[in-house]
Amino acid sequence: MENHDTQQLQALESAVKDWFKPLAYAIILLTDEAYPCVFYPDLFGAEYIDIKEDQEVHIIMPKVEELPGLLEARKLFAYGKQIDYFDHPNCIAFVRTGDETHPGCVVIMSNSEEGYKEIELGKEHADSVYIDFLKNRHEEISTDQNGKAVFRVNPGSVSVWVRKQ
């Protein structure tokens, strides 16, 4: 992800594409072993003027629209054991199983076309309905009698599926 050294006109300038930032933040914020860190301009946006080759350059760093939702998802759902579904080069998923007081979630992301994963959550999740907490997908997903369902994600996007209350 970007930081004060990698933003525009800085020594290590290396821009991360805007579409990819929510995917990276989903990994940083929702996986069990990641160290959560958020770059201030990604949360609040930033605008500044700097000098490049004796010319003033106006820099605008838009906020990552999904970031508040991902932070909220971390607080509410990113608990318990992690089960990875890293079986495709462009579409991955992981399940956070939850704990005694947090229900867990299914996180699925694609860096290419629309993707899906068939995931069995267990009989304790049988006949349940799931919604995308980030609202990138609008359908509801129902699990079968074994707690299995197909979870989908939009092209170049991330979805955090949680049990509907």
Residue ranges and their predicted role:
Residues 1-165:
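Carbohydrate-interacting/catalytic domains
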